[in-house]
Amino acid sequence: MAENLKGCSVCCKSSWNQLQDLCRLAKLSCPALGVSKKNLYDFEVEYLCDYKKIREQEYYLVKWRGYPDSENTWEPRQNLKCIRVLKQFHKDLERELVRRHRRSKPPRHLDPNLANYLVQKAKQRRALQRWEQELNAKRSHLGRITVENEVDLDGPPRSFVYINEYRVGEGITLNQVAVGCECQDCLLAPTGGCCPGASLHKFAYNDQGQVRLKAGQPIYECNSRCCCGYDCPNRVVQKGIRYDLCIFRTNDGRGWGVRTLEKIRKNSFVMEYVGEIITSEEAERRGQIYDRQGATYLFDLDYVEDVYTVDAAYYGNISHFVNHSCDPNLQVYNVFIDNLDERLPRIAFFATRTIWAGEELTFDYNMQVDPVDMESTRMDSNFGLAGLPGSPKKRVRIECKCGTTACRKYLF
């Protein structure tokens, strides 16, 4: 029996912080939890729970890191050295007072509902900070990820796993390319047209790494078999996200969104859309479930035929949080690198214009490409595409909230 259980694990019913609380309360050291004899009696402010003012003296109810709520204490302002925690507490307090149509100046005593809100906000912020750390630990790309929610008390999404590349479903194989280019300079002196030429297509980028192909034309990058190195100008998408991005909570009912923290030049690569690769049959089954939930993250890979779909509902990268717009600043391209199966392209987003720091990133879930272009990139009826007359896939009409002057009122 013991041999069968070897290597097994179960989820703990208590959080890491709760276990630390129990250790300190029982005066037990536990190196695995970071509780030792040296820090058993350390006092660090985790967050502030309440506020009051008595005879012009300010007091704060302190939650001490590693200690249960029963050990919270009221402390005068001069005893607290946690400047950032204090500033954040008052920022949250003032914002909530304004939201409740009161003065922004704090009262002498907080009512219980307001104090409870500030506690929940502090707990949420810690949860989002842990999620941000987790995302950055898992990312393989240069661009950092930050997380913000100044709108409501929603925390990290449940059951979402950050991945950097496709997660291949059962029965699906990504075949590795057998040959690569032999170019000395893939941009200025390509041999046989480099990798794009070998597939009878055009070179995709200029010397700044900006795409110069029309939307709908495929991108063929150099692969792991090529003689060129990492700095080759035909290696752009494979280098991953280069910009610092922020996952933020929208204030207009669109849930989470993504904005850039840096200027992005027109035609520059921004991110890939990754998730689970599943068959279209499985996508149809999941799509019916997602429709009932009022959301879907299905993206059909129908560059040549509709056989496979990318599902980013539970496995994906930051593109999972990018919202729709009828006037988007991102454009979809099909990309081929180490796998040349045209039924399984990688999906890349490029900037349609200069995007300034602080702007939200969006793409059109119902994107249409000129049907005259035989190399069309059709994002389908599942994720947003749609446009094929007589498509057998029926989707629930979802109201559009993009708010642009070009808004079509419905996503599908």
Swiss-Prot record:
Disulfide bonds: none
Known tissue expression: Widely expressed.
MF GO annotations: histone H3K9 methyltransferase activity; histone H3K9 trimethyltransferase activity; histone H3K9me2 methyltransferase activity; protein methyltransferase activity; RNA polymerase II transcription regulatory region sequence-specific DNA binding; transcription cis-regulatory region binding; zinc ion binding
Region feature (Mediates interaction with MECOM): 255-377
SMART domains: CHROMO, PostSET, PreSET, SET
GO process annotations (BP): blastocyst hatching; cell differentiation; cellular response to glucose starvation; cellular response to hypoxia; chromosome organization; circadian rhythm; determination of adult lifespan; DNA damage response
Family: Belongs to the class V-like SAM-binding methyltransferase superfamily. Histone-lysine methyltransferase family. Suvar3-9 subfamily.
Protein name: Histone-lysine N-methyltransferase SUV39H1
Organism: Mus musculus
Gene that encodes the chain: Suv39h1
